[in-house]
Amino acid sequence: MQQTPAKLVLENGSVYTGYAFGHIGETGGEVVFNTALTGYQEIVTDPSYAGQMVVMTYPLIGNYGVNQSDAESQKIWASALIVREMSNIHSNFAATGSLDQYLKEAKVMGLAGIDTRKLVREIRQKGAMRGVISAIDPDEKRLEEKALKIPEMTGLDLVKKVSTSQTYTIDCDDAEYHVVAYDYGIKQNILRMLQNAKCKVTVLNANTPIEEALKLDPDGIFLSNGPGDPFAVTYAIDNIKKLAEHNTQQKPVPLFGICLGHQLMSLAFGAKTYKLKFGHHGSNHPVKNLKSSSIEITSQNHGFAVAMESLPESLEMTHLNLYDQTVEGVRHKKLPCFSVQYHPEAAPGPHDSHYLFEQFTAMMDQAKENV
């Protein structure tokens, strides 16, 4: 197979030369790495990766192809996929095509044949950086200048880019609960997990006023994952503040947040967030449940975190990351509100934290009993 030469140039001038697959062109974004061994299709279709180019640390990617059921959204959101070796052969009974063709049809670039271990070490040491991949412009200095012009992730609201434009409902035949989900970049497996928990789910645009959500008479409200800087999503923070005020004055509506939703809920109650050096991206992060002292292996995908020292008196930390001692979960001491930084629905990843969806339904049951 003929290979098209391509380069990745980082904002600090580092150059990685390989070959392009998927779409042949030029693209840019923040370069981050993911330590999952499998799940590349779920990763590139996760809206949380909007504006980012993902480096897979596992050396061989594409060997089991792609299929529609593994997609976490309707399109590829990652700006590019960077791998050590791209498999030209896929073997999987469920595969409907190759990763190369999948990226090509979506006009998304891939870069292979580079030293991904060296690249990941550089990101770990220096932090996530902006970069440009090009198969059409060989001028490294010009590509470096293009990388420097890419907006930094700090201060960037990408939720507006990925959120649904229309309200839609996912029915459940044996539904016992009605959940309103704010779509900041929601993954399909989250919706499946809510369905499995016997929830009918109404999905709203991220900018929908909380008053409109409450008119739907939900049993609970869910705050989804999503991309970008949580501090920039001011309309979502204001919505959660209004919901908290509603919950103190009227019948409380339970609230559950995941990833960006966790950060937004924490900000609404007075905590602060900050950008991690290179983020948490992978399916093997150990998290300690501070109540049970059990250890959960979790799937994570976030570049920002809640500052532990900023947690207000009203919030209690419930989960702790054992890699870097960062906040992985909080709950409100008086209101029926809780959130986690990681992805209990996984996809890809372990299932250690599925119990959190049961915790959400138990909270909704209790709210019904207290009416």
UniProtKB/Swiss-Prot annotation:
SUPFAM superfamilies, alphabetized: Carbamoyl phosphate synthetase, small subunit N-terminal domain, Class I glutamine amidotransferase-like
GO MF entry, a single one: glutaminase activity
The keyword Transcription belongs to this UniProt entry's keyword annotation: no
Keyword Nucleotide-binding: yes
Any one GO biological process: 'de novo' pyrimidine nucleobase biosynthetic process
InterPro entries the UniProt entry points to: Anth_synth/Amidotransfase (IPR050472), CarbamoylP_synth_ssu (IPR006274), CarbamoylP_synth_ssu_N (IPR002474), CarbP_synth_ssu_N_sf (IPR036480), Class_I_gatase-like (IPR029062), CPSase_GATase1 (IPR035686), GATASE (IPR017926)
CPSase: region residues: 1-174
Functional pathway: Amino-acid biosynthesis; L-arginine biosynthesis; carbamoyl phosphate from bicarbonate: step 1/1; Pyrimidine metabolism; UMP biosynthesis via de novo pathway; (S)-dihydroorotate from bicarbonate: step 1/3
Binding site for L-glutamine: S48, G226, G228, L260, Q263, N301, G303, F304
Coiled-coil region: none
Keyword annotations from UniProtKB, A to Z: Amino-acid biosynthesis, Arginine biosynthesis, ATP-binding, Glutamine amidotransferase, Ligase, Nucleotide-binding, Pyrimidine biosynthesis
Active site, renumbered: C259 (nucleophile), H343, E345
Superkingdom per UniProt: Bacteria
Ranges of residues in domain Glutamine amidotransferase type-1: 178-370
Catalytic activity from the UniProt record: hydrogencarbonate + L-glutamine + 2 ATP + H2O = carbamoyl phosphate + L-glutamate + 2 ADP + phosphate + 2 H(+)
Matching Pfam families: CPSase_sm_chain (PF00988), GATase (PF00117)
Enzyme nomenclature, EC number: 6.3.5.5
Family classification: Belongs to the CarA family.
Function of the molecule: Small subunit of the glutamine-dependent carbamoyl phosphate synthetase (CPSase). CPSase catalyzes the formation of carbamoyl phosphate from the ammonia moiety of glutamine, carbonate, and phosphate donated by ATP, constituting the first step of 2 biosynthetic pathways, one leading to arginine and/or urea and the other to pyrimidine nucleotides. The small subunit (glutamine amidotransferase) binds and cleaves glutamine to supply the large subunit with the substrate ammonia.
PANTHER family hit by this protein: CARBAMOYL-PHOSPHATE SYNTHASE SMALL CHAIN, MULTIFUNCTIONAL TRYPTOPHAN BIOSYNTHESIS PROTEIN-RELATED
Subunit: Composed of two chains; the small (or glutamine) chain promotes the hydrolysis of glutamine to ammonia, which is used by the large (or ammonia) chain to synthesize carbamoyl phosphate. Tetramer of heterodimers (alpha,beta)4.
Protein name in UniProt: Carbamoyl phosphate synthase small chain
Source organism of this protein record: Prosthecochloris aestuarii (strain DSM 271 / SK 413)
Taxonomic classification: Bacteria, Pseudomonadati, Chlorobiota, Chlorobiia, Chlorobiales
Gene: carA
